[in-house]
């Protein structure tokens, strides 16, 4: 195999494809590599860790077709180190590949590409729809941080993608907080739902372009494809909890305040939070203010008071300050609404005038 590819294009492609190679030690060495295929369909880069996989096309000149597998990390380091514009040539001979440009050359040992598994492309038996890549990225990125990092309950370490009635939504929760993001997708008329491991979902949205993406899934796999690439991920087959049961239908207290004021007050209060990251959130009906108090015996204490439009009962709840801050960067509205349900019950945060995003957080023990 002999191929020539633009330096910048190859470096970018290798960087994105290497994300899907196996990072841990494995009995199948080729899983830690990138397979380069040069043939009638052009040049393709492939990688899989058996959880996720990618098949990406790249522009270049094929002087001699062939297939080769190279260590992903080493190839990424080499291709990212070439400066300037111009072409990189890869020439395969025996068990090595010579990578050369106008300024230097490297000889890299190959991996046994014959062991590379087939990347599955699911039949569209469960879901089949098209969506803008930029919309899909925003949908998943908005909720994925709320997924649990633990592997004890795989469903809580996942992002739920579901559709019904022309609306598609993404949901994630770690049982302490929950985020739901909805967008209108009129072309979707058949209900569906599937669970993607949150880590896989984040790798996918860091890779797909902003153009139209076709999404299709069966019971075990989901694929995201466009003319330049195809990505797959295994699905979590455990049922997702019925989170709608915990979303409050009514509230005892509601306050509307400026998002930036709330964020700044939380940032200052965090300095004085205790080892549990706790701050106390108070709603004063008489003073029309939301208060944030924090105390740390080693540092000191703080008291913040934010003017608010407020109604309902006076109430005080304790929260992990990081969980209160997390949704604020995801809300574009200037003002937010804090809706409390009572002692020991969840707080709902929304942007004013934005029904597409909901964030729910459970209070800490008083």
Roles of regions detected by a PLM:
Residues 1-366:
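Structural preference for solvent-exposed beta-strand-turn elements
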């Amino acid at each position: 195999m002999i191929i020539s590819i633009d330096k910048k294009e190859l470096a970018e492609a290798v960087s994105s494809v290497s994300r899907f190679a196996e990072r841990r030690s494995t009995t199948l060495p080729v899983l830690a590599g990138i397979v380069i295929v040069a043939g009638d369909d052009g040049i393709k880069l492939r990688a899989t860790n058996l959880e996720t996989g990618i098949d990406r096309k790249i522009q270049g000149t094929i002087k001699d077709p062939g297939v080769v597998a190279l260590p992903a990390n080493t190839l990424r380091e080499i291709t990212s180190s070439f400066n300037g514009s111009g072409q990189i040539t890869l020439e395969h001979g025996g068990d090595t590949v010579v990578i050369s440009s106008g300024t230097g050359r490297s000889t890299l040992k190959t991996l046994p590409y014959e062991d590379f598994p087939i990347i599955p492309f699911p039949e569209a038996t469960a879901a089949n729809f098209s969506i803008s890549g930029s919309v899909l990225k925003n949908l998943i990125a908005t909720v994925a941080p709320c997924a649990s990092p633990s592997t004890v309950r795989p469903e809580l370490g996942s992002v739920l993608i579901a559709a019904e009635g022309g609306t598609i939504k993404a949901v994630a929760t770690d049982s302490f907080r929950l985020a739901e993001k909805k967008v209108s997708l009129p072309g979707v008329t058949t209900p569906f739902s599937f669970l993607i491991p949150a880590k896989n979902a984040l790798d996918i949205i860091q890779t797909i372009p902003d153009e139209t993406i076709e999404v299709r899934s069966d019971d075990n796999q989901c694929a995201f494809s466009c003319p330049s690439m195809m990505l797959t991920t295994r699905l979590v087959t455990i049922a997702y909890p019925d989170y709608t049961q915990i979303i409050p239908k009514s509230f005892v207290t509601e306050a509307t305040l400026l998002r930036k004021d709330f964020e700044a007050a939380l940032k200052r209060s965090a300095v004085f939070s205790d080892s549990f990251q706790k701050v106390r959130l108070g709603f004063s009906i008489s003073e029309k203010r939301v208060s944030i108090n924090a105390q740390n015996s080693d540092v000191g204490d703080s008291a913040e008071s934010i003017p608010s439009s407020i109604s309902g009962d006076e109430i005080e709840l304790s929260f992990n300050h990081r969980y209160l801050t997390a949704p604020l960067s995801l809300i574009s509205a200037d003002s937010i609404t804090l809706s409390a349900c009572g002692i020991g019950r969840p707080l709902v945060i929304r942007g004013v005038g934005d029904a597409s995003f909901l964030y729910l957080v459970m209070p800490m023990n008083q």
